[in-house]
Structures are given as C-alpha cells and as structure tokens.
C-alpha cells in the first residue's frame, strides 16, 4: 500500500507540477453577519492564498475554503480568536488528488483496445475522440459543429443532435470552470445517452423530433488541460495580457450581463476576474456569436459543480425575472424528478438568492437576450469531496442530472414561444 501511494504521489508530481500536500479544506458555518464580514475580509487577504470553494453568503450557509499548508495554523488561530467554529472537511487535498490520478491512469490502461468508460475522468483528447466516435456511429442524428478555437488554439467542438429541418434548439454546455470535472463527464454521458436511445426511448425520440440539441462538453478546453497537467484547482481560462503576470479570466464573469458589477473582481489575479471587457475571452465570444447567429435557441442550460443547486436568473441583481413563476415551477419539477432516482436533493431559486450576487454570468446574458428557459445546475456534492468528486459518482450524477434536464427540455418542447 505504501509503495502504491508513493507511486501515485510521484505520478502526481510528474503530471501535475503544483502539489497540494498538507492543504486542508475547512468547513465553516458563520452564525451572524459580523462573522460573514470577517470571513469576507479573510478572503481578501491575498498573501494567505486561500481558495474559497463556497464563499461566505448569509448566516447559517456553509463556507468551504481550501487552506494551503503554510497558512493552516494562522487561519485556524484567527478563526478561533474570532469565535468562528470550523471543522476539517478534507484532511489532505493531495491524498485525494493522488487517488484521482491513479484511477485515471488505471482506466487508461483498461480502455486500451476496449470501450470508452463513461464512469471515469478523461483527458481532453480522449473526450474529443469519443465525440468523433458518436458522430461516426450516428451519422443521421449526430454531427460536429466547430465554434472556433480557444486562446491556446484548441478546437471548441459542439455536438448537434438533429433529425433535420429548421427546428428550435436547446443549448447545453459544461466545464466552463476547468476544475469542475464531473460536469464534462456528465455532459459526455448525456451525449451518449441521447445518441444511443433515440428511436427506442420515447422521451428522447419525442424531444428530437421537435427540437435540436447543441451540446458543448468542454467549454474551457485550455483550462481543462491545465487542470489535468499542472494545477488541478485551476478555474479560469488561460488567456494572457500585457501588464499582468497573472493568467486567465473567470469565463462565467465575462458575459455582457451587468459586466463588472457585484460578485466579479477587477483584479487579474483573482479567480473571479471578469476580464478587460465583456466577451474578451474567445471561448465566451464564440458561444455568443453562435447563439445570436442561430436565432432559434429557446433554452440555455449550463452545468457547474458543486453544491446541488438548480438556479435561474438573476445573478447580477436580486430582483425576480419577469418569468419567475414559470421558471421556478419548471426548476422545482426538474429537481423533484432528479431526486426520485438516488434521493439527491437540490435547492432551487434565482442565483442571487440561492448563492450570491454575481455579475457577468452566462444564463443572465441568455435570459436578457430573450432565451426564457435559462438554467444553471450545480451538480454533486454538498460536502466531503467538493470539486474532487470520485469517479465512482460520475454515473449516478449523470443519470439523475439527465432526469432534471429531460424535465426542462420537455417543458420547452410543450411551451413554444
């Protein structure tokens, strides 16, 4: 066992230059507003290099923060001095990363000459190869649309599911934040589900006889590759700009939806950096241009992780959208359908009230463009693993998410506008 762990650690060093040995994820539940303000001040202390996986919002809501080993004692002493209770959610982040890397390498060996394993995490190259396989195996149903290239010149490939004709469309994307690996895996499983079950599953057949589906499994390909090869905790794009040594923009703060407002940072080194202007990121602009040119997209759905949430506009402001009642009803039904499979509970509501105010988000942009059915999923889990969800949870996550997606898609089909 010791040799196995040593090998895994060595492989982690080779494949992922930045290690997180001794880093801990703390769970904090602030009890009042003063503690919220204190945690927000702590978040602003850049020298501590804290990574807030779940930021402070309101009293009683859980906060998760990854604390580098070098800052652990200082942070714990500070929390105790302020009377803020905490517990350790992840004892050593690197242990989970080593296990994750070992599982990926084992799966790569197992897949050689065999079938694609949808219950494993994959490289970008492997994902793109499987997308090509789906197109080749389903020529009358699935095609590949290239939106262009990422900042580092990787293709942005979309799968189009269509039975022909000029139909209204549903847009579904995943992986806009690089480190949220379960979203890319869920999207690819969903693509296979749609392709495999058309013609035999009445629900999928009915949907595709009425609607086209455009699915982008990896919205941020550069960030995804970087998260696998260099820094597992990477969130942003990989764009570079003169005058700053910090790399990347938060692509879900870069849309033209109250750009630069609350919940987005003007600091290029922040994980929530909104970028120099709306749509500055080629990955965002490519989607914007495609959606606008298509002209008949009726639903815009994006997959994130984690926290088990199903949200709709608005994020950039805390007022209800005009279609609040309908969006809330659809989301509640989708969450109920999802829960029936494995008992996974989702919280439902507008972004601003469910998590926090955040400007420049994709579904706010889509809704303001006139795409009424705009939703964001935050997939599993709520604690324990955070962004490092074990591969064994990919399948149940994808299966239950599909039930929520299907509920939304059926509503879109039955309520044309």
Curated annotation (Swiss-Prot):
Active-site residues (renumbered): 378 (proton donor/acceptor)
Q: Which GO terms describe its biological process?
A: proteolysis
Instruction: Give the record's cofactor note, including how many are bound.
Output: Binds 1 zinc ion per subunit.
Q: What is its EC number?
A: 3.4.17.15
Needed cofactors, names only, are: Zn(2+)
Q: Which reaction does it catalyse?
A: Similar to that of carboxypeptidase A (EC 3.4.17.1), but with a preference for bulkier C-terminal residues
* Boundaries of every Peptidase M14 domain copy: 120-412
Task of the protein = Carboxypeptidase that catalyzes the release of a C-terminal amino acid, with a preference for large aromatic C-terminal residues.
The family classification in the record reads: Belongs to the peptidase M14 family.
User: Which protein is depicted?
Assistant: Carboxypeptidase A2
């Amino acid at each position: 066992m010791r040799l196995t762990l040593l090998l895994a650690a060595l492989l982690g060093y080779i494949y992922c230059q930045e290690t997180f040995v001794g880093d801990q994820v703390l769970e904090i539940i602030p009890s009042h507003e003063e503690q919220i303000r204190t945690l927000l001040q702590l978040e602003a202390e850049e020298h501590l290099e804290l990574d807030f996986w779940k930021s402070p919002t309101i009293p009683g809501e859980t906060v998760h923060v990854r604390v580098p080993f070098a800052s652990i004692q200082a942070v714990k002493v500070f929390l105790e001095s302020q009377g803020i209770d905490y517990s350790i959610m992840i004892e050593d982040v690197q242990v989970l990363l080593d296990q994750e890397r070992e599982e990926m390498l084992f799966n790569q060996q197992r897949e050689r000459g065999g079938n694609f394993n949808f219950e494993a995490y994959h490289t970008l190259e492997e994902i793109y190869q499987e997308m090509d396989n789906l197109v080749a195996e389903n020529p009358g149903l699935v095609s590949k649309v290239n939106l262009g290239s990422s900042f580092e010149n990787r293709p942005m490939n979309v799968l189009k599911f269509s039975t022909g004709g000029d139909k209204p469309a549903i847009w579904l994307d995943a992986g806009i934040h690089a480190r949220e690996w379960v979203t890319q895996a869920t999207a690819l499983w969903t693509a296979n589900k749609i392709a495999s079950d058309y013609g035999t599953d009445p629900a999928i057949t009915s949907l595709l006889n009425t609607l086209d589906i455009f699915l982008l499994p990896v919205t941020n390909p550069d960030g995804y590759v970087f998260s696998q090869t260099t820094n597992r905790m990477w969130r942003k794009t990989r764009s570079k700009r003169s005058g700053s040594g910090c790399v990347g923009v938060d692509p879900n703060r870069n849309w033209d939806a109250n750009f630069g407002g609350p919940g987005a940072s003007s600091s290029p080194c922040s994980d929530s950096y909104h970028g120099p202007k709306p749509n500055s990121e080629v990955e965002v602009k490519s989607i914007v241009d495609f959606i606008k040119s298509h002209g008949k997209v009726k639903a815009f759905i994006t997959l994130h992780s984690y926290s088990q949430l199903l949200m709709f506009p608005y994020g950039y402001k805390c007022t209800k959208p005009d279609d609040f009642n309908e969006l809330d009803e659809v989301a509640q039904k989708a969450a109920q359908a999802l829960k029936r499979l494995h008992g996974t509970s989702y919280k439902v509501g507008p972004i601003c009230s469910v998590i926090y105010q955040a400007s420049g988000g994709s579904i706010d942009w889509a809704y303001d463009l006139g795409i009424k059915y705009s939703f964001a999923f935050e997939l599993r889990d709520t604690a324990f693993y955070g962004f490092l969800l074990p591969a064994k949870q990919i399948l149940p996550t994808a299966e239950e998410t599909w039930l929520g997606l299907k509920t939304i898609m059926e509503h879109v089909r039955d309520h044309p506008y």
